[in-house]
Amino acid sequence: MNNLLNILTDHKKKYEIFELLENLYKSISLSKLKNTKIKTHNLDSYSNLESSNFDVVLFHSKVIKPTIINYQDITKSFDLNNVNYDEILDANLNYLLRSYKVNKIFLFSNISIDKINNEKLVLIKIDINNDKLMYERTLTMHSFVNSNLFKNNTCFIDTDVFINFEELNIFSKNFDIALTHRTKQTFMPINEGVILVKKNGISNAKEFFRNYMNIYSFICRSNYVKNFYGNNIYIWRGGQLSLNLLVYNKGSIFKDYENFYVDKNLILILPSFNYNFTPKAQTTYSLSYLRKKSIIHYKGHKLKKIFSNFKSIYF
């Protein structure tokens, strides 16, 4: 009986994310969302050329001290310091470098990549405050679209996101920015791990990411957020929450391939089932099944541990 009560309580907490989104959206709509002064990364020393191929933007930070992620809508807390992103980042970089459909890979990081020497990989060394980890990630995207590097169709992805470019026939569709949504109602609807941006609307994309940053700064001061998540969403959750507020629409219940406008950008909503698929740790998948997915997201600390089981897809 107690176990059932715990499960119901856990699900209730997760469903409350929709109430939080609604309350925050109303507070943002009613307030004058000021343009926060944002200090972007100076990327003038880097260059890029126009190409029919994709650019990929990644963000990676070395976390040294114990960093516990524990929010009420996360089933089990975990320590970022115990999650090995190095192996999955290395596999992803080597996989991307072999693709003839990739123009450049821009890696924003505070580490060195000495063992990879390839002109397609551009390492952008930056100082990263790990106490504001997800804020720093959002800042890199904002900096990129406001630099001379943003010249091509661009995939902003987490380091644990693998793109099957043979199946990613998406940039021919009508949109400016494509996002993926999850239908399971205990998760935040839009996942920030996959953001696809077309090059045709550069000025509008700048506005989109500027407001992304503005909302982030605003909600960090919100009592709604502090009551739900505590005092620090700079380190985790803040980026995803800000993105969901930016595209908040009809209660955030989205349809597959739905279109609507945000900041003059035509948004396309893609199903996570194909474009942000997360394998379940307890489920067995055939390689042919996984190879048909356009984008696979090895999300969660459990999946990092079993990633070696899926390596043969990419090598």
Regions found by a protein language model. Give the residues of each.
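N-terminal anchoring/stem segment of glycosyltransferases
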Residues: 3-130, 146-150, 199-200
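Extracellular/periplasmic catalytic domains that process cell-envelope and extracellular macromolecules
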Residues: 47-52, 172, 187-189, 287-291
